[in-house]
């Protein structure tokens, strides 16, 4: 019922000897993720939490058959880390790093597309398939295995919605934090299609926010391609135009990207929009009864 990662995922951690990399490598391994290695130039032969360290992604893949990488490196080096992962044979790259220059993100995303590699992020919390695998920085205790897909532009609101879903008895198939920057990898349409194609996923929770037109495009995509129940929450409903709210991509500009416009787009195609995150489970259950 999961997408992108599962119990067979073989994960490496780029930047594993750094503070964030080592901390989250330990947490992911503790959760049960198959963390098979990490990279840090010049530190091959070391171990972090019992995880072997390699100089390069190519070396790590050759030794461990890793297929997924998560990146914890400073923003100026994130593009090179993504390119190295793509060239090294990784099929799914998750970039946690915040503050990646936009042109660096554009270059990395373009190269990934050319090479057929999937990317999550940058500036994202990663993803989790509960009780199977977690590649990210998410608080695992709130998640429960189930049949609802979760797609979110917001990190902390993901956790709030997931907590509400779990409390309502709606476990999650996979929860994906797509990232809050203007340029990121997999987005609403691609992930909605993956959940649509996954036979055991029966519903979707989508968390959007102000800025850009991703939610408007998602609404049209749902109308044309998605038959499973979807419930939506849009953050930033009180945000003033021109002021950045948290993420680099969360800004209303040129008279577009407001919460009201996004809410209207979903309601126009029959997708219910929650005014509070706590309403998401009820909206999904109402649709599943039809």
Q: Model-found features: residue ranges?
A:
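Catalytic-core regions of core metabolic enzymes
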Residues: 1-290
